[in-house]
Curated annotation (Swiss-Prot):
UniProtKB keywords: Glycoprotein, Hydrolase, Membrane, Metal-binding, Metalloprotease, Protease, Transmembrane, Transmembrane helix, Vacuole, Zinc
Superkingdom of the source species: Eukaryota
Top-level enzyme category: hydrolase
Biological function: May be involved in vacuolar sorting and osmoregulation.
Glycosylation sites: 147, 177, 473, 669, 778, 821, 850, 875, 977
Gene3D superfamilies: Zn peptidases
PANTHER family named in the record: METALLOPEPTIDASE M28 FAMILY MEMBER (PTHR12147), VACUOLAR MEMBRANE PROTEASE (PTHR12147:SF58)
Keyword Metal-binding attributed: yes
Protein name (database record): Vacuolar membrane protease
Species of the source: Debaryomyces hansenii (strain ATCC 36239 / CBS 767 / BCRC 21394 / JCM 1990 / NBRC 0083 / IGC 2968)
Length: 1016
């Protein structure tokens, strides 16, 4: 009986019954736990908050979409002229703006380079306008350089050659005298000349119109006399040597000036940006203007010579030694210096943006004694104020600090963040022991990052740049979005691929986002150390004032990392809990069976449906463990720490990077047409912006859903396809070509050659081959590759220029008379010569010197240049200078500029003079020039080492002079018969027959050059 009972108890049916009972008990317990959870279920509002802010795929994806859209909108609004600038409502300001706009229309009526009659028209218009305005005031006066009192001769800085420039100035100067004569004056400067190919509305018509607006304001009734004297410099010939500004340095009024505001235009419309400032002391006053817009990123570009064009700022700062700022329009550069820089392509708001900011800056500096006025008595203040300025703006808010202060902030953050982080890590890993980070966790982000950047670099330079190298000209934003989406997708695949391969690895998914945040902050920490070290030694040529966003990106990542570390340091977790539950909410996305999101688990509970055996909460565990861990993970899913980290890191980082990148690329992308080096730089910058923009999103990439992944794939695919299909040049983003028609009288007296400069690989050849004159005459197009990716294409043309109505032969355009050959044949004497250049209706000529021994000499043999005043000149076979040659010794003549008693302009340079540029105001007055140069035996060291005496010959020491003169007059030489007398018909042809995606600019000081070679 006992055996029977015992056998019955161990029978399969009995064991099945016990199993069923146990299962029933567990099911009952599970149901009770679920019921307990459901009974404590929060209300609808709390569930909605949890649904939005819980760490779920849908929530993260929603946050990412909102961030991207908000970033695009905010940056567009901040940089938008229409949104950020409002037209004046004040009656006086409205009147000033209307008058300035009318002035701008008058100034931009025609092209007005220094080499054109249009330049005289603008000068005369401004002179009449100034005279009218100053007649209203008792404390305003003017001065005109046209009386020849400010002609100068000076050395022009150039790395390739030594050039001396003679310039006759016709600047227009206005002095608004201040009530306190002890205060140093403020200079406001703009130039009224344009290039020959442009109407000069933005460059620099709006600067000139702003000067007139300032003058209009201070000459208006009811406006008090300023405390500080204000000098307005309407200067000429900025475009080809910054000559008007250089001339002003020699004017008596310059001695009063200590500060300056330079108004310029290196783009065509839009907003006027604060390009750069000499120092913090003066830049800080720009924060008081009503619509501040600027970034020291452009300052870094200028100071490091990434931007090749220069402004008068350079003259005032480097040669004049005064302190000020450079305010200019900065985009787009493909319209800059072309016929599209006209009144029809700009907005009155652009003028008001420059004019209002200029008025505000002038008002704040001139209405009071500023701290810079007293720096001579305060050395400490002087040291700080003369530091480089770091500045930026956003939504008309302006931020500026001195470089030393940013260095101090950087050093503090670099030290404090690790000091806080290290103790927290010690607490977490040595005491709490609640966070497991293994080898895979530590290396997967660096591996993913490096692989993604390498692939991105290959795609950028070997695919995009090879297929469509000029695409950034029209679509840099498309390339950024393509690379941005690709970079996110690559990291998504690499990170989750590693998770999939090592899915059985203990602790693989343990707070992955925090690991990535910490590693990202470490990368920024290293970069910030390098940047701070360089900023502490900041100088021109090695400027780092534009790298200020690094500290902000580092701080944002560090705050997110510290928040995560604090959370772990206060978390209570038992070892048993760790052993049984090493999985974490951040699951890999490639394994659907093992990694369901929390939202689905919660839905199962609330619906009463059975819990799936493949739940992510605990693999291969008992049902009670499943239930316990499920409820635990559901509670974890309600954690909002991720959302705090996301909000702290991602939105602001995206905004900073995108705003900085947008300003940088929109200002530089057109320079891809200027050189191969610029092209490489732009592609590198595009790649940098794409990577930096994507990095803040990477810690949260484990939780993006299929919708966002699909969107990224679509963006990448559409962008990649556009690389093959989209043209880099269109009507809004034209191909920029540079034109000059050359006549070389040594080669032909009836044939001219059109030279066109552009980038190699551009459609330039096709454009030129389609010109009617080439097709009709069957002239060949000769193209030669130049340095740095440029190309010169030339063709002969029968479209002769009509530079002067009285000239019928090319030889009449340029006649060089040799007035005097060497004054002595003595082999050790100073050789000298003298020429007169006759050119009709001309203002600019350039002379290049060589010698029969030039190739063997390390420097030019010309040492002295003399430019004669014809009314003082007395021709004599015995005199080169106004004194006897026997009385003249080279050592007695001071190096640099000097004048003799007859008014001759003399410049001496012992290092040699390679070129001389002559600029005069008279249209028909000849150039009268003298030279002194060294004979071979005096200048050549090699002669000392020769055993044989080479006899002295005059021919051996002849001075060769290449004379080239330029004309910039467009329009018609004879208004009675316009169809036949177009001044430069070859230029008219390229304008008329080029496609609408081509814009034309000048290559030289004029659109036509005539050259001739002589020896003396």
């Amino acid at each position: 009986m006992a055996e029977t009972e015992s056998g019955t108890g161990n029978s399969p049916s009995h064991r099945l019954s016990e199993t069923s009972n146990a299962s029933g008990n567990r099911s009952h317990q599970q149901s009770k736990q679920i019921a307990s959870y459901k009974s404590s279920k929060p209300n609808v509002f709390i569930r909605f908050i949890r649904a939005i802010f819980g760490y779920r795929k849908t929530s993260v994806t929603l946050f990412v979409f909102i961030t991207i859209i908000a970033t695009l909108i905010l940056v567009e609004l901040s940089n938008s002229l229409d949104f950020s600038v409002k037209l004046p409502t004040n009656n006086l300001e409205r009147t000033i703006l209307d008058n300035s706009w009318l002035d701008l229309q008058k100034i931009g009526k025609e092209e007005h380079p220094y080499t054109s009659k249009g330049n005289d028209y603008v000068h005369d218009y401004l002179e009449a306008k100034i005279t009218e305005l100053i007649g209203k005031s008792l404390f305003i006066e003017c001065d005109n350089d046209v009386n020849y009192t400010n002609n100068i001769i000076f050395k022009t800085e150039n790395d390739l050659y030594n050039q001396v420039t003679y310039y006759e100035s016709n600047n227009l100067l206005v002095r608004i005298n201040g009530s306190d004569s002890s205060l140093p004056a403020l200079l406001v400067s703009a130039h009224f000349d344009s290039v020959p190919s442009s109407f000069g509305v933005t460059d620099d018509g709006m600067g000139i119109a702003s000067l007139l607006g300032i003058l209009n304001y201070y000459s208006s009734d009811g406006i008090d006399q300023p405390m500080r004297t204000i000098i307005l410099n309407f200067n000429n010939n900025e475009e080809f040597g910054l000559m008007g500004a250089t001339s002003f340095l020699h004017h008596p009024w310059f001695k009063q000036v200590r500060y300056f505001l330079n108004l310029e235009g290196t783009g065509a419309g839009g907003k006027a940006v604060l390009f750069r400032g000499t120092d913090y002391g003066i830049v800080k006053y720009f924060k008081h203007v009503r619509y501040p817009f600027g970034t020291s990123l452009f300052q870094q570009g200028f100071n490091n010579h990434l931007i090749h064009s220069e402004t008068d700022y350079k003259i005032y700062k480097e040669n004049g030694g005064i302190r000020g700022i450079d305010l200019a329009f900065y985009k787009p550069r493909d319209i800059y210096h072309t016929a599209s820089d006209s009144i029809k392509n700009i907005d009155i708001k652009s003028l008001w943006h420059m004019l209002s900011n200029s008025l505000d800056f002038v008002e704040i500096v001139s209405s009071q004694r500023i701290d810079l006025d007293d720096e001579d008595t305060s050395p400490e203040s002087d040291e700080k104020s003369r530091e480089f300025a770091i500045f930026s703006s956003f939504f008309n808010w302006f931020f500026v600090i001195p470089a030393s202060q940013l260095v101090l902030i950087n050093v503090t953050c670099l030290a404090v963040i690790p000091l806080i982080s290290l103790p927290l890590l010690v607490i977490i890993f040595n005491y709490k022991k609640n966070w497991h980070i293994g080898f895979i966790n530590a290396i997967k982000f660096p591996v993913s990052l490096v692989l993604s950047i390498c692939i991105l670099n290959i795609i950028t330079h070997n695919v995009i740049a090879s297929i469509n190298e000029f695409l950034p000209n029209s679509s840099y934003d498309s390339i950024v979005s393509t690379l941005y989406s690709l970079f996110l997708l690559l990291n998504y695949l690499f990170l989750n691929g590693i998770n999939f391969i090592f899915k059985g690895y203990k602790g693989l998914y343990h707070d992955e986002k925090l690991i990535l945040i910490i590693q990202t902050s470490f990368i920024y920490w290293v970069l910030l150390i390098v940047s701070t070290n360089k900023l502490s030694k900041n100088k021109i040529g090695n400027d780092h004032t534009g790298e200020f966003p690094l500290i902000m990106l580092f701080l944002l990542q560090s705050i997110g990392a510290l928040f995560g570390l604090f959370s772990w340091s206060f978390k209570k977790t038992t070892p048993d809990e760790l052993r049984n539950n090493d999985d974490e909410a951040c699951q890999a996305l490639l394994s659907r069976e093992e990694h369901n999101n929390y939202g689905s688990n919660e839905a199962e509970l609330e619906s009463g449906e059975p819990i799936s055996s493949n739940s992510s909460v605990s693999l291969n565990s008992s049902s009670s463990q499943v239930t316990n861990n499920l409820v635990k993970n559901l509670r974890k899913s309600f954690s909002y720490d991720w959302s705090i980290q996301y909000v702290v890191i991602v939105p602001l980082s995206s905004l900073i990077v995108y705003n900085t990148g947008s300003l940088l690329l929109s200002g530089l992308n057109k320079s891809i047409q200027e050189s191969l080096n610029a092209e490489k730089l732009i592609f590198d910058l595009i790649q940098l912006v794409a990577v930096t923009l994507a990095i803040p999103f990477l810690p949260f990439i484990f939780k993006i859903n299929r919708l966002l992944v699909t969107a990224l794939v679509l963006v990448f695919c559409s962008g990649f396809i556009s690389i093959f299909l989209k043209s880099p040049f269109d009507q809004l983003n034209p191909l920029k070509l540079r034109f000059v028609q050359s006549i070389n009288l040594d080669e032909s007296s009836d044939i001219s050659v059109v030279n066109v400069f552009g980038r190699y690989g551009s459609p330039m050849n096709n454009v030129l081959l389609d010109l009617p004159s080439l097709k009709e005459t069957n002239e060949s197009l000769e193209c030669n590759n130049l340095q740095d990716g440029m190309q010169l294409c030339s063709y002969k043309t029968l479209l002769s220029p009509n530079l002067s109505p009285d000239v019928t032969d090319f030889n009449d355009y340029l006649d060089v008379q040799v007035l005097k050959n060497s004054s002595s044949d003595y082999p050790y004497g100073l050789l000298s010569g003298e020429i007169k250049i006759n050119v009709p209706e001309n203002r600019v000529c350039r002379l290049s010197f060589n010698n029969s021994n030039f190739e063997n000499s390390k420097q030019s043999l010309v040492r002295t240049i003399l430019v004669y005043e014809d009314n003082n000149y007395e021709n004599s076979s015995n005199k080169l200078f106004p004194f006897e040659v026997s009385e003249f010794q080279l050592a007695n003549l001071p190096e640099g500029f000097s004048r003799d008693k007859k008014g001759t302009y003399i410049y001496k340079n012992l290092n040699g003079i390679d070129k001389l540029e002559l600029n005069k105001l008279s249209w028909d007055k000849p150039y009268h020039v003298g030279f002194q140069w060294m004979p071979k035996f005096v200048d050549s060291v090699s002669a000392e080492n020769e055993n044989t005496n080479v006899p002295y010959t005059t021919d051996f020491n002849n001075l060769g002079i290449q004379v080239e003169c330029f004309w910039g007059n467009l329009g018609y030489a004879n208004n009675e018969n316009k169809s036949e007398d177009e001044r430069i018909p070859a230029y008219g042809e390229v304008l008329h027959y080029s496609p609408n995606y081509v814009s034309w600019a000048n290559k030289e000081s004029g659109l036509v050059s005539v050259s001739k070679y002589v020896e003396i």
